[in-house]
Amino acid sequence: MRTVVALRFLALSAAAAFFAPVPAGAQSGPEVARTYREANEAALVRDFATLLSYPNVASDSVNIRRTAAYIRDELSAVGVAARLLEVPGAPPLVYGTLTVPGATRTLGVYVHYDGQPVNPEEWSHAPFEPTLYTRAMEADGQPVALPADGAAVDPESRIYARSAGDDKAPIAAILPVLRAFRESGVTPTSNLVFLLDGEEEAGSPHLRQYLETYRELWDPVDLWLFFDGPAHQSGRPQLTFGVRGTMGMQVTVYGAVRNLHSGHYGNWAPDTPLVLADLLRSMKDPYTGEVLVEGFYDTVEPLGAEERAALAALPAYDEELKKELGMLWSEGEPATLAERLMLPSLTIRGMTAANTGALATNVVPNEATAALGIRLVKGNDPAHMRGLVEAHIRKQGYHIVREDPDMETRLRYEKIAKVTGGGGYPAARSSMSHPRIQEVIAAAGAAADRAFGEGSLVLTPALGGSLPLYLFTDVLERPFVNVPVANHDNNQHAADENLRIANLWYAIDLYAALLTMPQGGIS
């Protein structure tokens, strides 16, 4: 407890020295941030490239620690009292505070600094060697050198690297906001608590432990802002008030004990990829998208009136999105994408059986495996949903095992499925009418109006992706708002991930607005 008190005292002292009084008639927070950005665009792009050059896969313990230390030092340089928190066997959590004298509202800021694993062979450039393009690659953009001081930066240019969109962009945007405030004497209207997660892409398995171990550090927070995710598919900025939960399972079916010559044994030995496809087809209609697992939709919590109204007000963009993605149809038509995201989903996220392409051989594969991705909505429990899927597999006549079957098991059961995985976390949702959330909506709406025109902000009941936000509503008992800034076509989780520079500029403006929003702040 002494450590926590000392940290708060140091943060308060630093803030008092950091923020000088602002003369009457001075620029607003967003104006100060915009002026700073316009004068330093080239340097900001280079700083972003430096951040992106730090490898950040959670399982790479050496580099993930280097990344955490770099971010800690960058936060410290702009006046945040930052340090690394530790629990056994986990990447460090970057924690920081900025205490504002007289502030009566405390905002928590969540960002994750880890990224998805990479396969360099799939990338046009090395994933941790950031490369600037004049436009998106798909729009015939060309690679260019990072800008020198004074050089113009085209807002339509894009920087390509792992985590450019998910989720280092918020870090690259919040740092110049705090630096601009420091240099201009602008005082935030809220105390700030920073939490940077180092294993979100791995499911944040230690986040609960961090929240419980250091509970006193999070208790002052009134509202959590989650800086993660993409803009609406229409390109308009959005706020989201919920996220889907997630879980994964892996299913393997078996034939012979080894791969067999397809000439000698084909048309006789079990064709395991086809057997697996039949099992998967029994789980879901590939055209309607309906999951056929009994009870899959039974625990879905109905949307409230405010969520239904928000859904009805969303811009119609499905047809344009289909054209952009080269699709003539979608699952569940005529339901919209936004409506479909309000339901749990089952996706076949990967399949393996022998080899393809240049490595293909004339064999009957001895086994075939599918990785299942299941997204959850409010009301779904991960363990319960796993149980439903396993019950469905058993109804198809399978004996379920947890390890590869031995010969005795193979000769006892005709149909065997190894089922593993199943961890994950539930969905979370906050009320859009919460007073603190209404403050965020007002500030974000003003920022969106300035950048995109009046009425541009989209309010979405829940993001399609997943974040462990249930820990903040269920463990810390605090509301949250998700504040996405990445372009919707940022290739999140895929090769050639990127960020459109205009989205970085908007993030700077938006964060400046949130950090200086009125009501409930300075007394």
Q: How should each PLM-predicted stretch be described?
A:
Residues 152-242, 522-523:
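Acidic/histidine-rich catalytic neighborhood of metal-dependent amide-processing enzymes
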Residues 22-26:
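Sec/Tat signal peptide C-region and signal peptidase I cleavage site
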Residues 8-21:
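Bacterial N-terminal signal peptides
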Residues 113-115, 195-204, 227-232, 255-257, ...:
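Acidic, glycine-rich active-site loops and adjacent beta-strand->loop/helix elements
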Residues 256-320:
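Polar, glycine-rich mid-to-C-terminal structural blocks
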